[in-house]
Swiss-Prot record:
Organism: Arabidopsis thaliana
Membrane spanning stretches: none
Keyword match Ubl conjugation: no
Low complexity composition bias: residue spans: 318-327
Gene behind this protein: BHLH14
Cell division listed as a keyword: no
Any one GO BP annotation for this protein: negative regulation of gene expression
One Gene Ontology cellular component annotation held by this UniProt entry: nucleus
Name of the protein described by the UniProt record: Transcription factor bHLH14
Region (Disordered): 192-243, 312-343
Domain bHLH: 245-294
Keywords: DNA-binding, Nucleus, Transcription, Transcription regulation
Biased composition annotated in UniProt, kind: Polar residues: 328-342
Annotated localization: Nucleus
Amino acid sequence: MYNLTFSPSLSSSLLSFTQQTPAAIVSSSPPDLVLQQKLRFVVETSPDRWAYVIFWQKMFDDQSDRSYLVWVDGHFCGNKNNNSQENYTTNSIECELMMDGGDDLELFYAASFYGEDRSPRKEVSDESLVWLTGPDELRFSNYERAKEAGFHGVHTLVSIPINNGIIELGSSESIIQNRNFINRVKSIFGSGKTTKHTNQTGSYPKPAVSDHSKSGNQQFGSERKRRRKLETTRVAAATKEKHHPAVLSHVEAEKQRREKLNHRFYALRAIVPKVSRMDKASLLSDAVSYIESLKSKIDDLETEIKKMKMTETDKLDNSSSNTSPSSVEYQVNQKPSKSNRGSDLEVQVKIVGEEAIIRVQTENVNHPTSALMSALMEMDCRVQHANASRLSQVMVQDVVVLVPEGLRSEDRLRTTLVRTLSL
């Protein structure tokens, strides 16, 4: 096992390419190609469309007594069928992400060679082949770099072990495992004489620069300009960080902000049940849809609760209008007392199982609500639901209570309640 570490030695790797045309590369002998040509040869002659290829070299640090992988060289092809630009113009969420981070796939590739503290690390085995296809395999992989790759739009991530490191390839398309392709990559890099580096002091190696003439076709000219622009930007940033600590502090703050934002995206992705794609824009869109569906469910539940309450009230009104032995209205002329003097009391009781529905109608004098609650407490009846409404000078109270076993008779409960309220 060894650490996947990223080397700042970008200047050499960015310039290590030649002006040889793809046709000439195909017809030439792969073992004779220099490292950059080999990387281009692998992706340009493959029937599948790979977005990038990276050569990670195995290194050993005597100080920590550990082996790790370090960036040596790479080649970025991009997504030829990428139609994300159209999506960015039609979706406000994706436009915002585009302005903030640019092309996720290219940013993921560029982050590999910026600096060791700006990219994720993961211990991997130099003898194991990794071929992950589809968002689910990348998302649930134990390979941390695979999760990060899937989050940046990679749908296929391949890590092929060779003699002194690994060859990593990524694509935005789903590519099934191809044994012939794996063997061809191993033969190209296993038989080549790639410069071997040692790192006994813990410093990063610098790959050899291949010579090339100033004349060449336009296909490699645009690649040269893009690579030189990236290198110039990196060198300028490194110089400013060295001479201006304030800039370094700002860069560190920006790095922490992006890490915090990524962690929040990870948390959001964990709670959203269905994610259509692994990029940030799709994740936000899926999260919005999920929240809207939850709001719709809440509205439906609230509507059902209102209907149930209305149905319960209608049943109670119907039961009070029917005269039966189990539902008799008692008109009690209470004696003048301290609690309720000169008021008419009307009590209706309906028992259903262990619960009873009680309606008490009385004059709105001497705090009838408190009197009813006190009476129920004395009777050891637990109140489940209570509702009180005033109509002119009449107070109507509807109460649902749990009835103790000794009072689970409508006549007995009604008589006991009337007697308790009359005291």
